[in-house]
Amino acid sequence: MGSCGAVGSVRARYLVFLQYLGTDFNGVAAVRGNPRAVGVLNFLEEAAKRLNSVDPVRFTISSRTDAGVHALSNAAHLDIQRRPGQSPFSPEVVAKALNTHLKHPAIRVLKAFRVPNDFHARHAATSRTYQYRLATGCSWPNQLPVFEQNVCWALQTEYLDMAAMQEAAQHLLGTHDFSAFQSAGSPVTNTVRTLRRVSVSPGPASPFVLPEGSRRLQFWTLEFESQSFLYRQVRRMTAVLVAVGLGILAPTQVKVILESQDPLGKYQARVAPARGLFLKSVLYDNFGPTS
């Protein structure tokens, strides 16, 4: 698994699984040249300096998440090149060192694995699953309990038609050109994706929300699984499904929107807020945070 850079030194590649609360970050990617913005990887790269790699450690992320988006489990690979005569770190040492030296409490490394030097965290992923959390029953935004702030989209409505949303979601299943749900700014030219699973179901409130505080509220979870997604595809699909739940769109109109391949249409151009979105998991054939 090792290869030589400096004479006699060995480069080792690791896959790390990490989670973060995205509220304080300008996305997961490292931000360069802007002292007022910071990404999750800025903190990880700073922590990795303590590993004393011959070459600076850079993380290659599996799934880029936007500002305010959270991750229950994202993944990245990194290379550590030790000095001649030094053995590669064990994965356990890498995970512990990163967590020890992380300077932000909203980031945590879950697990690390030693992987081949040609392993790529983005290209090797076989599945990605996102969750989107909704709350209904809020008469005004600050009615949401403190422990649900910034982790769901609070809709100022008492009712969502879940049956209609579930019907509409079925039109998104399978292999399609999802360009109608891609936001501008992506370099991707192939907009065909396969949505393997989509579900709309009641979801739990935070366990820290008191019963009397959540009695008037109902929480819902939308879940999407694919090998990969287009830029903001999940948030735009969520916004359209919410429009169906509110009665603004009929379920069959989702099929029309999908087939239009028009990202600038009145309804599909809307993007659900970042705060309700969680990257739930990134899967690989041989590695996982619970392996």
From Swiss-Prot:
Enzyme superclass (EC): isomerase
Which family does the similarity line name?
Belongs to the tRNA pseudouridine synthase TruA family.
Record-given protein name? tRNA pseudouridine synthase-like 1
User: For this protein, what is the EC number?
Assistant: 5.4.99.-
Which positions are annotated as binding substrate? 130
What Gene Ontology terms for biological process does this UniProt record contain?
A: pseudouridine synthesis; tRNA processing
Do the record's keywords include Isomerase? yes
Q: Which Pfam families match?
A: PseudoU_synth_1
Q: Which domain of life is it from?
A: Eukaryota
Instruction: Identify the species of origin.
Output: Mus musculus
Its encoding gene is what?
A: Pusl1
GO CC annotations, alphabetized: mitochondrion
